């Protein structure tokens, strides 16, 4: 389905130059002189290569319709993840690189949404937030209270994040899977 370039959003799948691409980032740029244009960072679904494209906002692009299907994460198998269809209990093997930077946030029995184009998987969406344990946290530096000060901490999945000074090693926190940022202390 054709749509204007300025309506492209991250996560959509488009067809360009005879290939399928998933949109990673988009930004509308309005220069001081001349018309606005859209800068799009996208990844080739077949090769995994990234590229940047620029279109005028009035240009049209071919957007592919995606279908979303829920699966349950089972386990890792080399460079692949094994997912189970909760309705048919059928197992599906997907390449780990479909997850991108979110791969470390996978947890047993996590419900994932797989985006399909004509039956082919083109992307995987994790839950927006996960609960993890802090395994290392730097001590608080006294006297840094003039501004909101965060300190570095390492999560149980190996990812580093910034947490408020009252969070200590051994505590469980909620983090965003999109950017590994701290949300809150886990309840219960």
Curated annotation (Swiss-Prot):
GO BP terms, alphabetized: peptide biosynthetic process
Keyword Flavoprotein belongs to the record: no
Cell compartments where the protein resides: Cytoplasm
Gene Ontology CC: one annotated term: cytoplasm
Listed pathway(s): Protein biosynthesis; polypeptide chain elongation
The keyword Protein biosynthesis appears for this protein: yes
InterPro entries, sorted: Elong-fact-P_C (IPR015365), NA-bd_OB-fold (IPR012340), Rib_uL2_dom2 (IPR014722), Transl_elong_fac_P/YeiP (IPR020599), Transl_elong_KOW-like (IPR013185), Transl_elong_P/YeiP_cen (IPR001059), Transl_elong_P/YeiP_CS (IPR013852), Transl_elongation_fac_P (IPR011768)
Alphabetical list of Pfam families matching this protein: EFP, EFP_N, Elong-fact-P_C
Disulfide pattern: none
Keywords: Cytoplasm, Elongation factor, Protein biosynthesis
Entry's Gene Ontology molecular function annotations: translation elongation factor activity
Function: Involved in peptide bond synthesis. Stimulates efficient translation and peptide-bond synthesis on native or reconstituted 70S ribosomes in vitro. Probably functions indirectly by altering the affinity of the ribosome for aminoacyl-tRNA, thus increasing their reactivity as acceptors for peptidyl transferase.
NCBIfam families: efp, PRK00529.1
Family, per entry: Belongs to the elongation factor P family.
Protein name: Elongation factor P
Species name: Gluconacetobacter diazotrophicus (strain ATCC 49037 / DSM 5601 / CCUG 37298 / CIP 103539 / LMG 7603 / PAl5)
